[in-house]
Amino acid sequence: SAQVMMSAIAVLVATVGVHTIGTLRREAFAAKQLGQYRLKQKLGSGGMGDVYLAEHQMMKRPCAVKIIRPDRARDPRMLARFEREVRATAKLSHWNSIDIYDYGRTADGTFYYVMEYLPGHNVGELVEEYGPIPAGRTVYLMDQVCSALQEAHGIGLVHRDIKPANIFCAYRGGVFDVAKLLDFGLAKPSFSSSNGDAQLTTEGSITGSPLFMSPEQATGEDQVDGRSDIYSLGAVIYFMLTGRPPFESENPIKVMIAHASQDVVPPRLVNPDISPEFEEIILRCLEKDAEHRFQDVASLQRALRELDVDDPWTSARAIEWWSCNGCPERKKMAAELVEAAAL
């Protein structure tokens, strides 16, 4: 009947319309290009901008492109932080710090920088998806983070935003469980700088992530040194082993007050499998008074290496774990994973 025919035509038009819209959206996204970099897939979003999987058009090298969001690009302080993140990270060459490839601005005023692409999980994702991380693997990963921080601290650079989301557990160069320290957007020289970088953060302002910030950051102290990063490392280790941060509240102010004034619940009360020796290391990192913490990252790293853990993590165990669990972004590295695990 005519009514049936009209219904069929309507369905056909709707189907074609949806297909056309979908095609146009895909083509619009595929057309996104920044200089020599073609954006392929959105990987995530942060406080300042969005991160995309991209490819260099000439070299065909996969990379990650971070683009500052338009609403943030109008804020001079955000632009300063974005630029500082690029410059601070570009000073670092350690294997466990993320590599920066490029930095630029498009004709329409979009700021971006290009970094190495990391297939894997950040520490927050690891804990969320698989639960607390065993002591052996925690030591294995944090030993690498300590190495990256030694280089940063050695040139007077304090990270100031160490947290699970900024520590990536990656597959790089045929190696599994490579720890990468990310996001130096809050980094600040611990000594006076002639180029003015030290003035990019307002004196007395609160910087960092409340769940993992040091007491001196929580109270807005101007003089923050590498021992502040050591506190944050201790807070991250606490989280890795217990599945929860040292202090929790829906109110960030309460969390900061707790960091500054309250005793932390000993991690062994949360996870009895933690050894007394490991707990001692964590609690020393989390001392309120910076003078009572490890005084440098090298000292913390030595303590971690001297720790006698029941389940030492090895490269072989890392391959086994990754072959069983893969990545949260399932499409990232399936072929590479199967090949490497079979070797």
Where are these regions (language model features)?
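Protein kinase catalytic-loop region centered on the HRD/HxD motif
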Residues: 146-157
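A short, aromatic-enriched beta-strand patch in the conserved N-lobe beta-sheet
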Residues: 102-104
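Conserved short submotifs of the Hanks-type protein kinase catalytic core
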Residues: 108-122
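C-terminal lobe helix-coil module of Hanks-type protein kinase domains
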Residues: 149-150, 168, 209-341
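Activation segment of protein kinases
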Residues: 170-215, 219-223, 250
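AlphaC helix of the eukaryotic protein kinase fold
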Residues: 69-91
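Activation segment signature within eukaryotic-like protein kinase domains
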Residues: 141-142
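AlphaC helix of the protein kinase catalytic domain
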Residues: 122-133
